Amino acid sequence: MYPFAAIVGVLTAIFAYLLHLVLFSNLDYANLIYDQGYSLSWRILAVFLLPFIGIFLSKVFQVLLCGPTFVKSLAPLILKLDRNRDDIPFKDMFTHIISSALSVGFGGSAGLEAPSVLTGSAIGACVSRTLCIQGIPRSMLVSCGAAAAISAVFHSPIAAVLFVVEALLPECTFRTTLPPLIASACSAAFTKIFFSEGIDQAFFMNTIGPWGPRDIIAVLFCGVFTAVIGVLIIKSSIWVGTLSHKIKSPTLRFMIGCTILCVILFLFPMLRGQGYDSIEQLLVGDITALTEAPYQLQWLPPALIPCLILLAVFFLKPAASILTIEHGDGGIFAPTMFIGAFAGFFFAQVFNRLGIGHINPCNFAAIGICGVFAAVMRSPLAAIFLVVETTDCFGLFVPLMLVSGISSVFGRMMEPYSIYKKSLIAQGLISEDPLENRLKRLPVGRCFVSTPVTFKPDMLMADAFSLLKTEAPSYALSCVPVLNADGTLAGLVSLKELYDTTTYTSTTTVEQAMRQPAAVVHDTDTLDKVVKAMNKTKTSILPVLYFEDEKYVGLVSKESIFDKYLR
């Protein structure tokens, strides 16, 4: 198992490098288009149209090559991992590389982390299917690819594993954690050795200053503030997506969405792309990202510019990111970090202006990333190590731990679910209850019992009793199935009635004594459906039928379910 995890890690690192190469080539091409005209009107037109061109090309690529099944969110991946499935198409190994690079490379407002994770997951799934690996969960290498992708992009192997464990995997055990750990380490090592010049670390700053006991109060309040910002991102993202899908025509929805996106990015060019340049500026204390007015807004008073930029970051950036992802491709990972950096920096500036104390805005830019990331992704440990590994600010461990914990707690109070799991839980596909979640993953086939004896409807009850004593003297279930000649279920005979000879005469047939089951389940059902049917009908045993032809398979009881679940 572990050598295969290492293979997935190396392959994912290579594909992540290819994604960045394609992205940078698109950025160069977009800059070439921008520089072709020397007139101001040409450049303004290019700024407005380039995001539309990139998203349009991405959409055409998706429609022609991928069809309507193209997945752009991590929510379906979470569901596949929850169901232990590896049915990810082979083409997903390269489709996200091209699609996301077109969307983001031409100015779309999104990140490349989710496409990288989906690419890595597809690599893991293809390796699993190709090698026909036996004896391990089918989705194990899928999670290895996801961890390896984040590790390669951010050079953060620990945060990658923690994100997979906290946000993607349904359960955290030694067996589920060690393979992603190996894949993540191999991916980071391979990237460091062979691609260190091709993939830049997003932000590696040494301006993070020391913190003191007086900063603790500010950190506590910053945790609450970043929780509010994180919940705002979740709710605004869902609101924009819901509002967009109210437009029934796909063409009209695409045109309106892209027009709104282009207007937002035209007015606030700083929202374009992944936003790592702005994060880097804040981490070194450069307030240019907050004070420099774009050409389109230079007619406004300078004092108004920071307020407009902050409003755009907190309210328009989530909308722009969702529109980019919905109509093109990308992820919410980088936008979350972008908003978090501004949130932390803004909080520090306000705190200092109020005269409560003096805190380092650079420190709080990093702390803000941690807090908002923890609130949006519900991955507090991953948030801590992501900031530590990408900014090298090991001295901020305690403040990061505080803000991550507080933001996660308050974020969960305001919004119970992460941005990825909210839609899955709303559809009833997964549950926050670990017991129910496990039942959703177990098929009926794991728990049903093939009965050693069955009756025919025209049998006499006395003959049925003799048959049971002869064929299955230790029969432990509470009823015996009655089958028709074609193998379909006719009914059930209670074992209590069968043993109580006073309830029937010598001429009583099984058909006269049997009863219809309160409900039936199929071999394709999961155990959560079975338990719900048992609770609804107030029975402890149900017959299982084949889904294809409705023929009898066996019986499933609550005892067998709990026995299987508690193993």
Residue map of PLM features:
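ATP/adenylate-binding site constellation spanning eukaryotic-like Ser/Thr protein kinases
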Residues: A183, V403, L495, T507, ...
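Flexible loop/coil segments at beta-strand boundaries within sensory signal-transduction domains
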Residues: A485-T488, F547-K551
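Short hydrophobic beta-strand motif reused across regulatory alpha/beta modules
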Residues: A490-L498, V553-I561
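Alpha-helical transmembrane segments and immediately membrane-proximal extracytoplasmic
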Residues: M1-R441, G445-T451, F455-L467, S474-V480, ...
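Short, solvent-exposed beta-strand edge segments and adjacent coil->beta transition regions
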Residues: S450-P452, R515-A518
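The conserved cystathionine-beta-synthase
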Residues: F455-L477, L483, D500-T502, Q512, ...
